Amino acid sequence: DYVAVSPGNYGLDFMKKTYGYDLDRSVKCSNFIGDTIDMAVELGFKKMLLTGHIGKLIKVAGGIMNTHSKEADCRMELLAAFSVKEGVEIEKIRQVLDCVTTEEAIPILEDSGKLPAIMETIVERICFYLEKRAKGKLQIDCILYANEFGELAKSKEAVKWFTLLEQEQGQSI
C-alpha cells in the first residue's frame, strides 16, 4: 500500500541519517517523477513519500515531471517566483536569480527571514502537482532537503507516513 521514493542516493542517505529509515526498501526514480507516479498508481499503491533535494524537486513545483536538466532547468526562476510570493525584497530575488545552484540561493533566502515560508509554499506546490498527476488515486507526501542545510520542509502528513510504514511492516523505522 505504501511506497517510498527518492530521485537518487542523496535522498536515500538523507532519510537514513535524519529519520533512521533504511531506504534500501524504497524506489529510486532518477529524473522520472511523473512516470514513477504513473507506475505506483498502476501497481495499486495508495500512499507515496517522495524525498528529494531542493535542486531536483523545485522543478516539480513548476509542474515539471521529468527533472533532467536537458528537459527543463528553471530552478532559480521558480525559487525567485516563490520568493516574490512570500514578499522577499527585490534585491535578494535578483541575487537568487544570479545563483548557479539552489544550495547557493538558500543562505540568501535565509537572510531574508522568509526561508521557512518559501519552502513550505514550495512543498505545497510540489504536492499539488504530484497529486494532480496521480489523479486522486495516490496520496503523495514530500520531504524537501538541502545537503548543507538538512530538512527544509515537509508536507503535513509526511511524519504520519513513517508511523504507517512501521505498523504495516512491524518494525522500527
What are these regions (language model features)?
Residues 1-46, 56-57, 61-173:
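N-terminal loops that bind phosphate or other acidic moieties
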Residues 53:
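Glycine- and acidic-rich phosphate- and metal-coordinating loops
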